[in-house]
Amino acid sequence: MSVLINEKLHSRRLKWRWPLSRQVTLSIGTLAVLLTVWWTVATLQLISPLFLPPPQQVLEKLLTIAGPQGFMDATLWQHLAASLTRIMLALFAAVLFGIPVGIAMGLSPTVRGILDPIIELYRPVPPLAYLPLMVIWFGIGETSKILLIYLAIFAPVAMSALAGVKSVQQVRIRAAQSLGASRAQVLWFVILPGALPEILTGLRIGLGVGWSTLVAAELIAATRGLGFMVQSAGEFLATDVVLAGIAVIAIIAFLLELGLRALQRRLTPWHGEVQ
């Protein structure tokens, strides 16, 4: 009898099992706590609404600028499209040039000796520091904006590709060579698959850096873009628009990050689950 009761209790526990993982639950709980604290502080007006509007006001403003009224002569969707175009073009260029450069540096000490000092010299410099050079050399058009974001993404991608090549076990390369594989076959079937986890991690890091550079890039005589919208709203003390723009940037960046994680799990299942 007691065995039957225990089995029933166990089946009920399984039936009512919480569907989300512990990590996801904690993340949602953290966001809920932050929103509650924000709402409480804003409602009690512990901070002036001019500097910290309540969440519902930010949501209302977000819906307003997403409509025909927009902000700064453009709707939210037009600002979003402009920013996504810039960052995707910069990311594509960084992948197109950064990965081959990183692989070449990993395979050739000569190439690494030539390019490594250049990358390491400019990599620690914040984008705002060479922003004036971009304007002087390339003007105030789209080229300077995209190039600024590209430079921010290029270094993490190239260095991750370099680290990926160096992480490939030499015994696998020698085994392929002993089986008669050509240099191109070793590169395509041994080195690239071995370096792929590091390369994809570099893309994730580079994309995060690219989003942080977006605001700086859109300071260059931009008329549309999320960074431009946030910067312009700050000049007019439109804090609700600033917070709405930051929220949109965070959500889009997070969705792209989830997409890259899914891609990494699919392309490199042997590397373990990406958390």
Swiss-Prot record:
The keyword Iron-sulfur does not apply. Belongs to the binding-protein-dependent transport system permease family. CysTW subfamily. The lineage of its organism: Bacteria, Pseudomonadati, Pseudomonadota, Gammaproteobacteria, Enterobacterales. NCBIfam families: PRK10160.1. Keywords: Cell inner membrane, Cell membrane, Membrane, Transmembrane, Transmembrane helix, Transport. The chain crosses the membrane at residues 20-42, 87-107, 124-144, 146-166, 186-206, 209-229, 236-256. Residues 80-264 form the ABC transmembrane type-1 domain. Part of a binding-protein-dependent transport system for taurine. Probably responsible for the translocation of the substrate across the membrane. It is found in: Cell inner membrane. GO terms for biological process: cellular response to sulfur starvation; taurine transmembrane transport. Gene3D superfamilies: MetI-like. Signal peptide: none annotated. GO terms for cellular component: ATP-binding cassette (ABC) transporter complex, substrate-binding subunit-containing; membrane; plasma membrane. It is a multi-pass membrane protein. This is Taurine transport system permease protein TauC. It comes from Escherichia coli (strain K12).
